[in-house]
Amino acid sequence: MGVLKRRVSSSRGLGGVLREQRAKLYIIKRCVVMLLCWQD
């Protein structure tokens, strides 16, 4: 994970990092929603 982040920051700059952060947040939110649905 660290290597990927370093490559992204060096090639695409801040925009790439922000996009990666948004994608990670989206994935985490999806996981939380799925877990909550499963618990019902």
From Swiss-Prot:
GO terms for biological process: negative regulation of cell population proliferation; shoot system development. GO terms for cellular component: plasma membrane. Residues 9-40 are annotated as: Required for DVL/RTFL small polypeptide activity. InterPro entries: DVL, DVL/RTFL_small_peptides. It comes from the Eukaryota. It is a single-pass membrane protein. The chain crosses the membrane at residues 12-28. Keywords: Cell membrane, Developmental protein, Membrane, Transmembrane, Transmembrane helix. It is found in: Cell membrane. Its main location: membrane. Belongs to the DVL/RTFL small polypeptides family. Small polypeptide acting as a regulatory molecule which coordinates cellular responses required for differentiation, growth and development, probably by restricting polar cell proliferation in lateral organs and coordinating socket cell recruitment and differentiation at trichome sites. This is Small polypeptide DEVIL 6. It comes from Arabidopsis thaliana.
